[in-house]
A protein has these predicted regions:
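A short acidic Gly-Thr/Ser loop motif
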Residues: 7-12, 130-136, 144, 224-227
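N-terminal basic/disordered segments at the start of proteins
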Residues: 1-27
């Protein structure tokens, strides 16, 4: 059975085509396009007409492709920008005209779904997954208990158990911070950069504090999303982008700081020319 899933975030819209047999994904093809649906939403709480147009156009091409490939079902979910926007129903009508039943999912569901996908690479390890998007960051702590621990957990041999201990969605993302602190300008000011740092540090510290009250400390921090993958791509100067070289890679705090300094020192045009950074990501 071929299934299609469309995920519409604040910055990107994604399509996954998955061949599923006996409840398992056998093959998957992924497609990503930057549509910037959340442009201006942090300030106005409304989706721009041109952003809706970009998004519906992208999704229309995704639906056409999925149906040509023989997808038996197409699921469409929307996240942070749609959650925040008062006129999200306008977008919903456009998507419904394509034959979809779009669902705006809560941040906690978004986080749990992300964790489900990520945890298969870290079976039997307690991990903290941070899915940093354009408008929000989902933090999830938990463990995918695999067959090696079946006797301990009382599962049937070969079974798996998803044990999520903490999940929270924080209104903190690259587009939200960029727009609130004018970070898309050429050479953003030290004051604006410091303001973004303080906001991020406070919100993340509070969320991590709540996690510490609810569960044991994780073994690993796993970064997910376009911000995390872009950091690796810029550091390693990937051109063209190669997901195989990004997946399960590592990056240090010092390296993140160096890349931040590099981006802050450049004009928008210069950021567009940085090897490894998608041109449409340069403004955020």
């Amino acid at each position: 059975m071929l299934l299609a899933a469309i995920d519409i975030g604040t910055v990107t819209a994604r399509l996954a085509l998955a061949q599923v047999e006996d409840g398992r994904v056998i093959r998957m093809a992924k497609y990503t396009e930057i549509v910037n649906l959340g442009e201006g939403v942090d300030k106005t709480k409304r989706l721009l007409p041109e952003a809706i147009h970009r998004c519906v156009g992208c999704v229309s091409s995704y639906v056409d492709h999925a149906r040509k490939e023989g997808a038996e079902a197409v699921v469409c979910t929307l996240t942070s920008a749609a959650r925040d926007a008062e006129n999200a129903p306008d977008l919903g009508m456009g998507l419904a005209s394509l034959g979809l039943e779009p669902m705006i999912i809560p941040g906690e569901i978004e986080g749990a779904l992300t964790f489900l996908g990520v945890s298969h690479d870290f079976e039997n390890h307690r991990i903290l997954v941070a899915d940093s998007g354009g408008g929000s960051t989902e933090l999830v702590v938990g463990t995918l208990v695999g067959q090696a621990a079946a006797q301990v957990t009382g599962q049937q041999p070969g079974g798996q158990q998803l044990d999520i201990n903490f999940v929270e969605s924080v209104d903190l993302g690259c587009r939200r911070l960029t727009e609130r602190f004018n970070l898309s300008l050429d050479h953003p000011s030290a004051e604006d950069i410091d303001g973004a740092h303080q906001m991020a540090a406070q919100m993340m510290s509070e969320a991590i504090g709540r996690a510490q009250q609810q569960c044991a400390a994780p073994e690993l921090l796993v970064g997910v999303g376009g911000t995390a993958t872009s950091l690796i791509a810029v550091r390693d100067r990937l051109n063209p982008y190669d997901p195989a070289k990004v997946h399960l890679n590592h990056i240090s705090i010092d390296e993140v700081s160096q890349i931040e300094g590099l981006l802050a020192s450049k004009t928008l045009k210069e950021r567009e020319d940085i090897t490894g950074l998608q041109v449409k990501r340069a403004p955020v």
